[in-house]
Amino acid sequence: MKKKNFLAIILILLISIVGVGCNRGEKSVRTLRVYNWQDYIDEGLDDNGEKVTTSVMEEWAADYKKRTGEDVEFVYNTFETNEYMLNVLKTGSEHYDLVCPSDYYIQKMISEDMLEKYEYDEKNGYKNVPNFNDYGSPFVKNIFESYETLNKETNESLTWANYAIPYMWGTMGFVYDMDKVAFEDVSTWDILWNEKYAKQSTAKNSVHDTYVAGAMHVYKDELLALKNQFEASDKTQEDKDYYNEKITEIMNRFDDETISLVEDALIEMKNNFYGFEVDNGKTDILGGTITINFAWGGDAVYSMDTADEDGNVTLGYAIPEEGSNVFFDGWVMPKGADVELAEDFLNFMCRPDIAARNMGFIGYTSSIAGNEIWELINEWYAVSDDEEGYPVDLSYFFKGTIDQEYLTDGKAIITVYERGRQFDAQYPTADVLLRCGVMKDFGEQNDAVLLMWENVKCGEIGGWLWVGFVMVLVVAGVFIAYQIKLNNKKKRRRRFSKWN
């Protein structure tokens, strides 16, 4: 009996050893899971949406294989709103290694302890994303290294740089028909309330963005007084910092009194504007449905590019004198992410040549600088050698990232052929950015602001009637949006060929 047991044990051990050997031979392939905005990375598509080359994701996988000898796979999915993205993560229905939220949602995710940290310190930057250390714009770096958010779970307050790596950035302003709208009128948020342009303007169907418009309108006198005070100052760095900090504070006032004032202002605005929108405004202005579109900079570029191609209307871009928002989207790693793989991918994304590809594909402005980005914007916007133009100093963005041969007297100066259009939507001057503040999360006043937004959107319509009405509109809107997307897909790509 003992002999049989002994033989059985030997047999089991032999099987186990063979099994281990087989398992070692079957090496598992790592998978990177990425969750991003729609049309927010170069997917290797042509103007008709057909696959013509490798996507950025595929190029990274090939590059990873070349460097490490290991295969890697990826899953790439998209979302349309921050709210939807956050709900997916919180329900646990999907797991991702990298997500690209807006700045105020980065704050929200930090505060709720939803994110992994990057290996980062103030002196040396990102240990495993050196390309961002080398080529990240000093302007964008300063924002992420200056702003802090409190993690409510750990009671630790750290800068955004510990949790996020910037991707794209831009401003909020107005795209407008230059033949029908006066520049002085569109240079103020008041244009949304201006009866001269009744039913000709749109506002964003986004509580954060439209709240800023309301606050800027409510506190216009205070903002213009600040502007005059700054203009009369010596414009020292201390003066500049104070001016920007005050604008940021005003646009992020969420006290009960301000919420009430903004609610009244937005309800009044509804009587004068064409309607709320998120994506349709950039096409409505092309067809003449509206003449003023409250827009993000990247969408403004799309509208102006398309208008130039079609030749039906000349569009411009203006950032209101009172001030506006400068926004940033950044890459964060949800808890449980494959940090090593995520950081490797981001280091690839922060190469200037890859950043230029993405920027050329989607129309928004990359947070990466460097020679390739400088060459790209010169191809797009600079005058020829024998032409006169408008010199613009972009040292605030490119300082320390481009070679000496591109500098003029030590400065990153580009001479552009026109102002107030695509170039200014992508690269506003340092002076303009002084009056642009960063949007903050609503924090403890979140419920109060959302209630205000419901009141603005619903008006006098009864609750359940409004819900039913909205459901009908949503179904119709999805169908219409799908048709628009099909019709306009081939025009979504920038028409510049160098990096496509």
State where each predicted segment sits.
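Hinge/lid segment of periplasmic solute-binding proteins
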Residues: 71, 77-86, 107-169, 183-187
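Early extracytoplasmic/lumenal segment of secretory-pathway proteins
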Residues: 25-112
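Short loop->beta-strand "edge-of-pocket" segments that line small-molecule binding or catalytic clefts
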Residues: 191-207
